[in-house]
Amino acid sequence: MGHLGFLVMIMVGVMASSVSGYGGGWINAHATFYGGGDASGTMGGACGYGNLYSQGYGTSTAALSTALFNNGLSCGSCFEIRCENDGKWCLPGSIVVTATNFCPPNNALANNNGGWCNPPLEHFDLAQPVFQRIAQYRAGIVPVSYRRVPCRRRGGIRFTINGHSYFNLVLITNVGGAGDVHSAAIKGSRTVWQAMSRNWGQNWQSNSYLNGQALSFKVTTSDGRTVVSFNAAPAGWSYGQTFAGGQFR
C-alpha cells in the first residue's frame, strides 16, 4: 500500500443508522451458493473487485439478484443473513457478507424453479464456504432473512489506478460504513475537484490528464457520508498501483 492520505470526514445528510435497512426489521429472501468449496469461482465479478482474497473480502461474499443489485450501486454493501424456517437444512447463527457480484436472471426458468435471481425476487447467491455456515450443502436453496449492516474494514479505503493518460479508471475497494460508493471525485495537485463517472461496478472514471500530480479522492456512500483522502497517491504514482486513504468510522 502506498502513502496514507490525510482523512477528513464530512457528515452530509443522514447518518449511517438510517441507511435503507439499517436498524430495521429482517426481510425475507432466499439463498443459494456458487463458486466451489474454495470459492475460486467467485473471483472477478460484476463489481470489478478481481481477486477477492487479496482485496480482503475473502469468502464472505454474495452475488445479488437484480432486485438487490441496483445496477451495481449496491457493490460493497454488507448484509447480515440467517437461514429461516427450515429445520432440516438450516444451521444456527448468522453471517455477514459483502456484495461483490451480480446474479443474472434466467427468464427461461420459473421464479420458483431455477429462476431464483429473476425480478422481483430478492436473492443471495453466496460463496459456498459462507453458505455452509448457515445451511447444509445438500439443501441447495434455503429461505433466509437479511438486513443491511455497516461494513467493518481494516485499514483505509483503497484506490487502484488503472487506465492511461486521459482515461483514469479508479477501482474503489475496502469501503467501511455503508460500503456502497454512490459518487466519487478526484483532484490533482494542479487541478480543482472533478466529479468522476461510474464506468462499471466500482470502477470510477476521470478523463483528465493527472499524470505527475498527487491525487486526492472524495468518496460518498449511499447514506450521504463523505470521506476525503488528501494526497492519497503521491505525485510519482503509476498505473496499476493501489493506495490507501481515509476510512468511514
From Swiss-Prot:
SUPFAM superfamilies recorded: Barwin-like endoglucanases, PHL pollen allergen
Expressing tissues: Most highly expressed in the young leaf petiole and midrib, in trichomes and at the base of the pedicel.
Signal peptide: 1-21
Subcellular location: Secreted, Cell wall; Membrane
Membrane topology type: Peripheral membrane protein
Superkingdom, natural source: Eukaryota
Main location: secreted
GO BP annotations, alphabetical order: anatomical structure morphogenesis; plant-type cell wall loosening
Entry-linked Gene3D superfamilies: Expansin, cellulose-binding-like domain (2.60.40.760), RlpA-like domain (2.40.40.10)
Domain Expansin-like EG45: 44-156
InterPro entries, per database record: Expan_Lol_pI, Expansin, Expansin/allergen_DPBB_dom, Expansin_CBD, Expansin_CBD_sf, RlpA-like_DPBB, RlpA-like_sf
Functional description taken from the UniProt entry: Causes loosening and extension of plant cell walls by disrupting non-covalent bonding between cellulose microfibrils and matrix glucans. No enzymatic activity has been found. Plays a major role in control of leaf growth and influences the mechanical breakage behavior of the pedicel.
Family: Belongs to the expansin family. Expansin A subfamily.
Name this polypeptide is given: Expansin-A10
Source organism: Arabidopsis thaliana (Mouse-ear cress)
